[in-house]
Amino acid sequence: MKVLVSAYQCAPGHGGEIGNGWMWSTALADYGHEVTVLTHAEFRDRVQAGGRSDIDFHFPDIKGIPFGALIGLDGYDAYRRWQNTAYEYAASLGRDWDVVHHVGWGSLHLGSRLWRLDAPLVYGPIGGGQTAPGEYWRYFGRDWVMELGRSAATGSLLRLNGWTKETVREAATVLVTNSATEAAVRRFGAKDVRYMLAEGLPEEWISGQRQRPSGVPVVLWVGRMLPRKAPTLAVQAFAELRKTMPARLVMAGDGPLLPQVQATVENLGLAADVDLLGRVPWTTLAQYYSESSMFLFCSLRDSSSAQFLEAMGKGLPATLLDLHGMADVKVGIAAEKVPLSRNPGELPGRLAAAMRTVLTADDWEARSAAAIEWASEHTFPSKAAAASRIYQEVTAS
């Protein structure tokens, strides 16, 4: 089929949104589709160096706005302006596509303009329907006011979001990555809603069988140090674990909360047991996943998690909060899920108890094997095959 892909960020050699855009595009082309991709001009050089001349990349740009110069609400406004530009650019090409697939950004709130084209739109996978638990406002600090605004925009004010309503109603299929987002799009009258994990892996990421690592257990945390990611909660939970057994915590990621995390480590007397790596290139992260004993994910608001899937792909058992997208994934013994406590003061201890279970139980290898088995179902070739079946359905109707 002739498929138009919208991927705001797209380049090889990355994880997250940037890698998703590239891997969606290449996987669909490898499946046999004739793929045209719209992405931001910021990625032109990296895309062209990727060596995929079989894919027709285009780079609509917003003049006068450097990519990455705007953050927060200004960044969202720039993205919406790019969306309008991308639609106008696609329409000006005068081509006939069989299907349009918007893969990034995958946001409930930001929509897509491409439903206006004369081809069925597959929208997503998207997230964004989840909101942060109010009892945990202290982890957000000064950002809690902004978080309350986002919660309102996701709740009662979402009905005022014309971009959301138009996209959801006009899309042939909406792919959602968690149940909260599913509920939101159904309220707006989406015609066809299906679950698909937002993230995927290249096939070569999947690990072979692993043995429990020897030596002092290593707990790995990966992500941007943002309030909603709750990196200080990770340190607090590790402090509780450290009271009961030897262990090390390795944290890969940077962001505005890094100084606060450093201070928390010092205040809890953990400097000898915690390694703060800062930002680590995606291609280097594989080594940390492969050498660690357990992955810790304690985000207080997330649609799903690329890092969790990456850890599973390397056979790394996990401890995580039973919340939002992580509550929806069915990974069996690969992860210990910890229910959110009404009393925030109890949560570090509960996370520590779950971590101790993963690290000391006799079934580490079985947990690792379950992680690999689940992650193997979410490679990009598998996602391209699933998307292709949807394309067949929406073009036949």
Language-model regions, residue ranges each:
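Short hydrophobic beta-strand element within catalytic cores of glycosyltransferases
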Residues: 317-322, 327
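Short alpha-helical donor nucleotide-sugar binding micro-motif in glycosyltransferases
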Residues: 279-280, 287-292
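Aromatic "clamp/platform" in nucleotide-sugar-dependent glycosyltransferases that forms part
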Residues: 300
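Nucleotide-activated donor-binding/catalytic signature segment of Leloir-type glycosyltransferases, i.e.
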Residues: 262-280
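Donor nucleotide-sugar binding/catalytic pocket of nucleotide-sugar-dependent glycosyltransferases
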Residues: 56-59, 123, 153-208
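A conserved mid-protein helix/loop that constitutes part of the nucleotide-sugar donor-binding site
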Residues: 19, 217, 224-240, 256-262
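N-terminal subdomain of nucleotide-sugar transferases
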Residues: 1-55, 95, 119, 381
